[in-house]
């Protein structure tokens, strides 16, 4: 699978294994987490703005320091929308989800426009257009399902040792003694990784004491 678990695993191990074959049941929308180290000056500024930051979090739906853009989508030019989306895509955290126009998650046309934009960014990051197309969901719009965040996930498919197998095209028929068999090909594998989830919320609490 290529949900939250798969996307994190693939991005992390692609440069550590000799060969990686990704068996994708269906693609998911995903955007960069954009994590980075915080400088001492930035940390000092954050501490100075604690009250402001917590006030924003208190106003937001999810408790994050992002508030939706208050402008009406139809009143904003295509160029201005693009500028906002570029800034949000390159920002850390959940900016593209939580600081966007309200209409992008409530109305079909704005959501389609945003989905097309994110698909364009995926194509820009994946060298092979056919692989990029297989990584783009066509059965739901951006933000319509829980969206995993990623670090270097799409770039992993530019590596010579990474291969994408779309199970929508060639479904798995069975697990074999040496790997697995799809409708078209037999794969010998050293390790079969089941990306079936993890304790995203409670795991850290379970480790206390």
For the regions a language model picked out, list residue spans one by one:
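Aromatic pocket-lining residues of Rossmann-like dinucleotide-binding sites
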Residues: 9-13
């Amino acid at each position: 699978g290529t949900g939250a678990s798969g996307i994190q695993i693939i991005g992390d191990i692609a440069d550590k294994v000799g060969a990686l074959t990704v068996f994708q049941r269906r693609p998911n929308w995903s955007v960069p987490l954009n994590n980075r180290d915080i400088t001492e000056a930035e940390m000092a500024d954050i501490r100075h703005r604690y009250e402001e930051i917590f006030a924003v979090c208190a106003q937001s739906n999810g408790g994050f320091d992002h508030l939706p853009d208050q402008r009406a989508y139809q009143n904003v030019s295509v160029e201005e929308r693009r500028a906002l989306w570029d800034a949000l895509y390159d920002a850390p955290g959940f900016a593209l989800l939580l600081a966007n126009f309200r209409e992008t998650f409530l109305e079909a046309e704005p959501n389609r426009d945003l989905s097309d934009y994110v698909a364009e960014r995926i194509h820009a990051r994946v060298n092979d257009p056919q692989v990029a197309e297989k990584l783009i969901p066509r059965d739901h719009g951006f933000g319509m399902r829980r969206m995993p965040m990623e670090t270097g996930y799409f770039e992993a498919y530019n590596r010579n040792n990474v291969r994408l197998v779309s199970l929508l095209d060639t479904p798995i028929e069975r697990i074999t003694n040496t790997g697995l068999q799809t409708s078209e090909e037999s794969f010998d594998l050293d390790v079969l990784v089941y990306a079936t989830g993890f304790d995203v919320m409670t795991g850290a609490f379970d480790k206390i004491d």
